[in-house]
Amino acid sequence: MKEQLNQLSAYQPGLSPRALKEKYGIEGDLYKLASNENLYGPSPKVKEAISAHLDELYYYPETGSPTLKAAISKHLNVDQSRILFGAGLDEVILMISRAVLTPGDTIVTSEATFGQYYHNAIVESANVIQVPLKDGGFDLEGILKEVNEDTSLVWLCNPNNPTGTYFNHESLDSFLSQVPPHVPVIIDEAYFEFVTAEDYPDTLALQQKYDNAFLLRTFSKAYGLAGLRVGYVVASEHAIEKWNIIRPPFNVTRISEYAAVAALEDQQYLKEVTHKNSVERERFYQLPQSEYFLPSQTNFIFVKTKRVNELYEALLNVGCITRPFPTGVRITIGFKEQNDKMLEVLSNFKYE
């Protein structure tokens, strides 16, 4: 058994609504607003696609997801040879880490970001340098100071999970221009579709300048397919060729592939969902207490407070399950009626 596994623990999901009701003696409905899922669900066309292909369940998937690859290639205007799929971005991150890292290698990322960058590096006996956040976001200058010729991977999350903050195009361009060209920089854009900031990076365009800039995206968030597990990386043809060796032969299911294609084709539905999210998101920042809310470009808001447990329980008492962190609570933006309840709590809470 790998000794480094003693440094880690298995992923611990939050308690189910039923378990929380029992623990806190809560009556009535509970709303799961802890995992940044798209509560509107996927496009109706997804359900149609799934129903149309249920008779194919006894077949293995087509390896490499060729139908979805062609659709993504057309949607993003990138060559199919630069795309690789995983069963969610969790698997994509695992594949990249497994393909690149050897014992003693070093990755550089941020503190308070998506935990799988760290987790998979430790599994591969690599060293992890975590740079503190700056104003709730990635400190690109601080990260750059830790990157050198021997760095094996750099992980950036934009917008960042769990804080929701982002860095702009100019900042990323400047950062990439100073990273050694042989050092892969992975930009995780899981929440890309929710972004409304005009200066958000055009990472696909930056890939034309920097061969070491690699892009992650997913169908789990805005497309509403978290339960079907489809994520992908857009990278150089050479990197994809090597990482594909690590990919399990049938990692993305047939149904998942059909569903993702249907979701991708319904861009009008996606626009409607992301618009609703931005409207509801803005309501939080209208509160006088919004100074405690980090500026978000996602479908969640990070609320800073020293009284984390009290805020978590106050939101739970109005039926909203959120995600506590050491320095605050992450709230998935819900439907209007759910947000109304949370806004009432947030407007009366003592944060200090």
Curated annotation (Swiss-Prot):
CDD domains named among the record's database cross-references: AAT_like
* A GO biological-process term: L-histidine biosynthetic process
* Its EC number(s): 2.6.1.9
InterPro entries from the entry? Aminotrans_II_pyridoxalP_BS, Aminotransferase_I/II_large, HisP_aminotrans, HistidinolP_aminotransfase, PyrdxlP-dep_Trfase, PyrdxlP-dep_Trfase_major, PyrdxlP-dep_Trfase_small
Instruction: Indicate yes or no for the key word Amino-acid biosynthesis.
Output: yes
**Record-level Gene Ontology MF annotations:** histidinol-phosphate transaminase activity; pyridoxal phosphate binding
Q: Which SUPFAM superfamilies match?
A: PLP-dependent transferases
HAMAP family xref list: HisC_aminotrans_2
Question: What family does the database annotate?
Answer: Belongs to the class-II pyridoxal-phosphate-dependent aminotransferase family. Histidinol-phosphate aminotransferase subfamily.
Q: What quaternary arrangement does the UniProt entry report? A: Homodimer.
Q: What is this protein called?
A: Histidinol-phosphate aminotransferase
Per the UniProt record, the source organism is Staphylococcus aureus (strain NCTC 8325 / PS 47)
What is this protein's gene name? hisC
